[in-house]
């Protein structure tokens, strides 16, 4: 079902000036909503482990929750978060498990252990988001060395994440390369504020710097949300691609935060971070093709 839009592109059933409510939802109930509206802000993944739901933080309420969350953990999804059938999303129930690297498959238990271990690193209060991503990347390099026939993949994941593995080189795209990649994949469907910022790190340090530290927990929560139940696991060529997906999420938040500071001349506040996260998820979950992202970062799996 399609719904009409006004001259500004907004849904004609959205009461912008009267409580910001949906007329269809109010008058006919959730079952009458178009599928995209019924599912938003949920993003579903279904595989051999079960049905998983994460949130699009383009939804302002979901984005605000990242700022105030004191703990980070995976919890069971219950109604109204979990929907009744039909559920739409990425259905990988009949697919092979995610790739460890281009020529080796994970098993589902091993992949689940890797995903949970990555989220556990992001939940650590003693690590910054950047440090956590580096830890995940380094541990993933050790996991990629696993081959069948010895210890289980689950055990290999536990061993790789148990100690600081930062000395293991982990290939990655730079901040500028990551933003440029997403900009190209957006194919002109977003405003020019996604264009890469020249001398990004210098300007970040001058305009944002330590003022962003108070929001580092929100950044870790956001990156964890993008790693949990991600689609890149089934669309990409290995675990490195998922790490790049997490790095892309962080890079876009940094980009949009700096862009707002360059425009305003101020210091970042909660509203700036919330809007930066919203714009990051708009791009990652609603604008670009995640399959195209997986193809674009595939060379890093070599």
Language-model features and meaning:
Residues 1-29:
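Structured, beta-strand-rich domain cores
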Residues 4-5, 31-34, 53, 243-247, ...:
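Generic alpha-helical scaffold signal
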Residues 6, 15-20, 90-102, 264-268:
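Intrinsically disordered, low-complexity coil segments
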Residues 27, 104, 239-243:
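Short, charged/polar micro-motifs that form catalytic or ligand-binding hotspots
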Residues 28-127:
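Internal, well-ordered alpha/beta segment that forms a basic, Gly-enriched binding/recognition surface
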Residues 120-302:
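Hydrophobic, aromatic-lined core segments that form the binding pocket/scaffold
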